[in-house]
From Swiss-Prot:
Record protein name field: Imidazole glycerol phosphate synthase subunit HisH
Domain spans labelled Glutamine amidotransferase type-1: 1-198
Location(s) in or outside the cell: Cytoplasm
EC number: 4.3.2.10, 3.5.1.2
Phylogenetic lineage: Archaea, Methanobacteriati, Methanobacteriota, Methanomada group, Methanobacteria
Catalytic activities: 5-[(5-phospho-1-deoxy-D-ribulos-1-ylimino)methylamino]-1-(5-phospho-beta-D-ribosyl)imidazole-4-carboxamide + L-glutamine = D-erythro-1-(imidazol-4-yl)glycerol 3-phosphate + 5-amino-1-(5-phospho-beta-D-ribosyl)imidazole-4-carboxamide + L-glutamate + H(+); L-glutamine + H2O = L-glutamate + NH4(+)
Domain of life: Archaea
InterPro entries (alphabetical): Class_I_gatase-like, GATASE, Imidazole-glycPsynth_HisH
Keyword Lyase carried by entry: yes
Stored CDD domains: GATase1_IGP_Synthase (cd01748)
Broad class of the protein's primary localization: cytoplasm
Keyword Phosphoprotein: no
Name of the gene encoding the protein in the UniProt record: hisH
One GO BP annotation of this record: L-histidine biosynthetic process
């Protein structure tokens, strides 16, 4: 069972429906016992970094423990950003710090938010993004991750090359929304299900 973490940030129904569409057993929950029992964790989310970290506070220990124990994890949009150490959006707020680095604002001169379809540039082999080369995915964000270690597997060009996906051991995360990205997005979720089964 895939546990989609409900921490009051974003439309969780669409990601749950996308997993069900590909035949995966997915449950939206904030119950730590269910998170512990799950085969994998998914952290979606939209909104502000600081607000998300405050809402995650009660689940932080469970979340970190499961990820550090090797449970497959997929972060989506804000769920990618909170993996990093800090964000320009919320100075002084600490992220989960599983991926060293910071989240920075899309530079001036670019329309913010970056909203709509954009193409992936695959920069490293990726289990999650197998078959996604040159595909278009749906993005909605004003900030992007800038990891300080070598975890970026895909970028997208929006006047500046931005992190589109990262992978580090059992941690997988996308800045784009696979659940809103048509068949290409469903393929990414299928790949995640295969990672869980491996």
């Amino acid at each position: 069972m895939i546990a989609i973490i409900d921490y009051g940030s974003g439309n969780l129904r669409s990601i749950a429906n996308a997993f069900r569409k590909i035949g995966a057993d997915a449950l939206v929950t904030s119950d730590p016992q269910i998170l512990e029992a799950a085969d994998a964790l998914v952290l979606p989310g939209v909104g502000a970094f600081g607000s998300a970290m405050a809402k995650l506070e009660g689940l932080r220990e469970t979340l970190l423990g499961n990820i550090m124990d090797g449970k497959p994890f997929l972060g989506i949009c804000l769920g990618l950003q909170v993996l990093l150490s800090e964000s320009q959006e919320s100075p002084g707020v600490h992220g989960l710090d599983l991926i060293p680095g910071r989240v920075i604002r899309i530079p001036p001169g670019n329309k913010v938010p970056h909203m709509g379809w954009n193409q992936l540039i695959i920069v490293e082999d990726s289990q999650l993004l197998e078959g996604a080369e040159d595909e278009y995915f749906y993005f909605v964000h004003s900030y992007y991750a800038e990891p300080s270690n070598d975890v970026v597997v895909a970028r997208t060009d929006y006047g500046v090359e931005m992190t589109a996906a990262i992978e580090s051991d059992n941690i997988h995360a996308t800045q784009f929304h696979p659940e809103k990205s048509g068949e290409a997005g469903l393929d990414v979720l299928r790949n995640f299900v295969e990672i869980i089964r491996a």
